[in-house]
Amino acid sequence: MPLPRFARAVLALPLAAIVACAGATPAPGIDPAPRPSGGAPPLPPIPQVDGPLAIRVVYPSANAVVTSRDSNFIFGSIGSGRATLTINGVAARVYPNGAFMTYLVNPPADTPRYELVATRGADTARATHVIRYPVRDVAVLDSAVAPAAKPDSLPTTRADTIAALHARVDSLRRQLTRDDPIGWVQLGQPSVAMDTDRTIIGKPIPGGTYKWFFTPGTIVPLLGRTAGYARIRLDHDLDVYVDSADAIDLPANMPAARRIVQNMRVRGAPLGVDVIMPLGPRVPYFVEELERSLVVTLYGVRANTDIVNFAPQDSMVRTVEWTQETPERAKVTVNLRAAPYGYLVFWENNALVLRLRGRPAIDQRHPLAGLTIAVDPGHPPGGATGPTGLYEGTATLVIGTRLKRILEERGATVLMTRTTDSAIALGDRPIFSRRANVHAFVSIHLNAYPDGVNPFVAPGTGTYFFRTHSEPLAREVQKGMVAQLGLINLGVNYDNLAVVRGTWYPAILCEGAFVILPDQEAALRTPEFQERYARGVADGVENYFRGLPSR
C-alpha cells in the first residue's frame, strides 16, 4: 500500500460503515470473516501452529500515538492457535496459526496500555503494551474568562454596529491590497532538453493535495512565503501554493511578460500527434480530460488564434477550439475522434506542446501480443506488515513476479519496476515506465486500515486510478480480481497516488487483499492465492485491451 496509506483505505469503505464504526461501542464477541463473493473459491485454510506461547503485538507498535476517538484494533500473534487470549479483559479471536486481531475500546487516557494474557492449559504468557494519545491543545475562549456582563466596548446601538461593519470591510480591503504580487519567481530550473518527468507541484492549500503540475522554468507572480511554502498567482482569480524551495526569486524590476496564444498547428509525432501552441515564456497550465477531448487551461494568457493547421495524416484530432474564459485565462479544447489514451505536455521553442498518444493495434484473439506492461510490486520503502510478520513488499514482489509470467504467456513484454527487495523511490517507478513507452502500468499492493476503523466491516478488494483515461482499466482489473479472489468488492476509486499520476499510459494501483487481517494474510502466504491475485489482474488487463478499439 503506497504512502499516505490510510486515506485510501477510508475512501474504500461505505460511508455508513465508517459512521457506524466511528461512534459505536464494539462488542467483545468474535467477528466472522467475510463471505466470498460470487462463485470464487474461498480463502485457503489457515495452517495450524502450536508453538511456545510468545505474545508479539505488530500494531499498534510500542509507544505509538493512537489517533482514534474511542475504539481501535490491535493485532499480532501469540505462537499457538490452541491458546486463548484476552486484551484488557476482552476475549480476542485467535486464528489457527496463532494470529490475533480484535477491535475494542481504547484504554483509559490515564493508563494508555493493553494488558495481554495468553493461556493454553497450564501455560500462561503476559505482556503489557503501552501506547500514547495525541497531545490535545486546550482552546481558551474569551467568553470563558470574560465577565458575564457585556463589556462597554461592544457596540450597543445600530450606528455603532454599522460603524463596526465598515471598519471590518476596511480591514478586509487592506488585506486584499496586501495580497498584490510582491515580485516574480521562476518555478524550478528549466531543462534544455525535453523533460516531461520533472514537474513542480501546485497545491490548493499549504500541505494539501497535489492538483497542478507545472513545467520547470514557469514564471509566475509571488504573493508571499510562509511555513515552507510560496504562494503564487496563476491569474487574477486563482492562487496556489508550491514548495518555497521551488520558487526562485527573479529581479525585482523584471517586466511582466505578455503571453498570447498565437496560431496553432497539429503535426505528426512519435507514437501520435503534437498540438503546438506558441506562447512565448512558459506559463502555468492545467489539463482536463473529458470523454473525447482534452482541455488545456492556460493561466495569465490571452488567446489570439486565427488559424489552426492540421497534419495531413492525423487521424486523432478532429478540431481545436479556444475560448477566453476571463481576461487572464484562456482555454484550448482539443476534440478527438476517440477517448484519450495517453498524453504528454512539454515546452519546445517557446511553445507548449500537447503530445497525444495513439492507441496500439490490438489483435482480438491475442489482445496483449506486442504490448509492454509495467508491473510495479509496491514497496519498499514503507508498507504494512501482517499479524504473523508477512511484509507487504515481500508479498507484492511474489505476486508481481507471477503476474509477469502470466502476461508473458499471453504475449506481452513486461517491465518490472523492481525485482529484488531493494527500495525503489515512488517517483522513479513512473519514470522508468514512461521512458519505456509502456502501454499500461499496474502497481500491486496490499491494504490496511487507519486507526479507529472496525477491520471486520469491509475487508475486500479495491482498485485505484488518478487520470480519467485510466478509469476503464481500473474497472476491468477490479472485475478480474473480484472474480478470482472472492472477497468483498470495494469498488473502483479515484485517488491522488504518486505511482498512478503518469499521463502517457493508463495507470492503476491494485489492493487485492488486506495483509493486516489474519485470514487474508495467511492466504497471501500460499501459492494458490498469490496465483489467483495475479491471474485476476492479468484477466482485467487483457479484457481492457480487448475492448480498447471500441472506446
Task: Report each predicted region and the residues it spans.
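Signal-peptide-cleaved, periplasmic/extracellular N-terminal interaction regions immediately downstream
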Residues: 22-33, 50-69, 75-78, 89, ...
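Stable alpha-helical elements in mature extracytoplasmic
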Residues: 168, 369, 392-395, 399, ...
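Solvent-exposed loop/turn segments at secondary-structure junctions
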Residues: 379-382, 419-424, 446-451, 468-471, ...
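Active-site-adjacent mobile loop/cap segments within catalytic or ligand-binding domains
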Residues: 440-443, 448-450, 462-465, 491-551
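Active-site histidine-acidic residue metal-binding/catalytic motifs
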Residues: 355-440, 450-453, 457-459
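Bacterial N-terminal signal peptides that target proteins for export
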Residues: 1-13
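Short, solvent-exposed loop/turn segments in extracellular or other extracytoplasmic domains
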Residues: 95-101
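C-terminal motif of bacterial Sec signal peptides marking the signal peptidase cleavage site
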Residues: 17-20
